[in-house]
A protein has these predicted regions:
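Mobile amphipathic helical/loop "lid" adjacent to a hydrophobic cofactor/ligand pocket
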Residues: 69, 73-172
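Conserved Rossmann-like nucleotide-cofactor binding loop
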Residues: 11, 35, 255
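Mid-domain catalytic core of redox enzymes
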Residues: 223-326
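N-terminal Rossmann-like FAD-binding beta1-loop-alpha1 element of flavoenzymes
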Residues: 2-29
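Conserved FAD-binding subdomain of flavin-dependent enzymes
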Residues: 35, 42, 47-80, 127-130
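Conserved flavin/dinucleotide-binding core of flavoenzymes
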Residues: 311, 317-439
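Glycine-rich FAD pyrophosphate-binding loop
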Residues: 20-44
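Helical element adjacent to the flavin cofactor pocket in flavoenzyme catalytic cores
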Residues: 180-238
């Protein structure tokens, strides 16, 4: 069987790695850019290792990447962010983030009665008896809840932090999604971790697994321009060649899939997903020649909805000796009247971020060796809110497979890319077995 995978990000690499284990499957992975990894692409500059976004993994002991580690034989190390060094700032007051019982007892975000209420909510989530799963959205649940406003604000902020979205969007996250996500996170013994060495450690090993099979081609800088069906095979056309395949996997944002299938018999089936919106944030990375300050590992500004991670406090492999790597992230609102309004908003976010750096890391400007600012970085191709629809891995009357962080799968962000890709690979292999039995 010959398989085409379109897209060389985390999902495409994962699907190809699983399929490459089967000696009867060969294929081509098409990637239009010069490098693999997609938004997990990693590069070095002046001794600093930079990602296009964070490489934190939430609840790693219950995460899909741990399953992949076992099934694909991956080798990597991770380090947990020190929970005692994770802080929230509200109205210029610093307090521990309520990541566990110890921090919850220490935090000043809630009074003693509110803490008891919040512990009760966490316990109910863990036991799968919290009724948030019966509400269409977090906003609907909070509207009927008799909890104090501080408890409601904390729920909103937790969802903002884990889903990388603004409070108004956090209220649109479906209740069942929140219930399942926090059930896993609250049960985890390792809530926030970094893959030491960044995503490159994972993507390099996935590529190596694919290469070692000898049956797969990694076609970099080769975009697929059209997909057709003829003589019981799929015909994929690129700028320089035309190839035939038995199965096709789309491992790319749904917005790009719609463009590629425009004018094809399958275009109408993609219409329900055309209006999906992406999760986008501002990313502000600074690599410092020396450690200017290390008051904590993470500071979240609850008032302005942005945070700074001292990435090098957890992962020392990303910096030259004596250096410091700080990453600022700002959650972004959508829906501006015009481009001028959007630009003014982004400029104000940049100023807020720099003010946060000034406040907690004085002297950073003079010690900056590397700076990278992305005012609109995609974190997930589909924001998991009620007004969007995640793309299923299979659609009725459409002969393709779909995977990625915008598809139905376990978890959020990278975990959904991994889980949907693993599901697709297993479905193709199962489909192949059934075809053999049928013949």
């Amino acid at each position: 069987m010959k398989v085409a995978i379109i897209g060389g990000g985390l999902a495409g690499l994962t699907a190809a790695a699983y399929l490459s284990k089967d000696p009867t499957v060969e294929g081509v992975l098409f990637e239009r850019s010069p490098q693999l990894g997609g938004r997990a692409f990693t590069y070095e500059k002046a001794g600093f290792t930079l990602n296009y976004g964070a490489h934190a993994v939430y609840g790693i002991d219950r995460h899909e990447i741990t399953v992949m580690e076992r099934e694909l034989g991956l080798t990597f190390h991770s380090k947990q962010v020190d929970k005692r060094q994770v802080m929230y700032a509200k109205h210029d007051q610093l307090t521990p983030a309520p990541l566990d019982f110890v921090n919850l007892m220490r935090t000043e975000l809630l009074n003693p009665r509110q803490k008891v209420r919040f512990v009760g909510e966490i316990t109910a989530i863990i036991a799968h008896i919290h009724n948030i799963k019966n509400y269409s959205t977090l906003g609907e649940y909070l509207a009927q809840s008799n909890a104090d406003e501080d408890v409601k604000e904390l729920w909103e902020h937790l969802v903002c932090s884990n889903f990388f979205i603004t409070p108004e969007e956090a209220r649109k996250v479906p209740g069942p999604v929140i219930s399942e996500y926090y059930h896993n996170l609250f049960l985890s013994n390792r809530p926030v971790n970094y893959i030491l060495g960044s995503w490159a450690v994972i993507t390099n090993q996935l590529r190596e697994k694919i290469d070692l099979s000898g049956r797969w081609e990694l076609a970099l800088q080769e975009a697929v321009e059209s997909v057709n069906y003829a003589e019981r095979q799929f015909v994929l056309k690129t700028k320089h060649r035309e190839l035939r395949f038995d199965r096709v996997v789309f491992a790319m944002p749904v917005q790009q899939i719609g463009k590629l299938l425009k004018g094809s018999p399958w275009e109408p089936f993609m219409v329900p997903y055309e209006s999906n919106t992406a999760t986008e944030v501002m990313v502000y990375d600074i690599g410092l020649k020396r450690v200017v300050a290390r008051p904590f590992s993470y500071i979240s500004d609850m008032d302005n909805k942005l945070f700074i991670s001292d990435v090098s406090a957890t992962d020392h492999t990303l910096v030259p000796e004596g250096g410091q790597l700080l990453q600022g992230i700002a959650y972004l609102s959508d829906g501006f009247a015009d481009e001028e309004e959007r630009k003014a908003y982004l400029d104000s976010k940049t100023k807020q971020m720099e003010a946060l750096f000034d406040h907690y890391y004085p002297g950073w400007r003079e010690e900056t060796a590397v700076k990278r600012v992305s005012k609109k970085a995609m974190v997930a191709s589909v924001k998991n809110i009620a007004t969007n629809r995640l793309l299923p891995t299979r659609i009725d009357h459409v002969p393709f497979y779909f995977c990625g962080d915008g598809c139905v799968g376990k978890g959020e962000l990278a975990e959904r890319a991994f889980s949907s890709a693993r599901q697709v690979a297993k479905a193709i292999l199962e489909d192949m077995k059934l075809s053999c039995v049928g013949n």
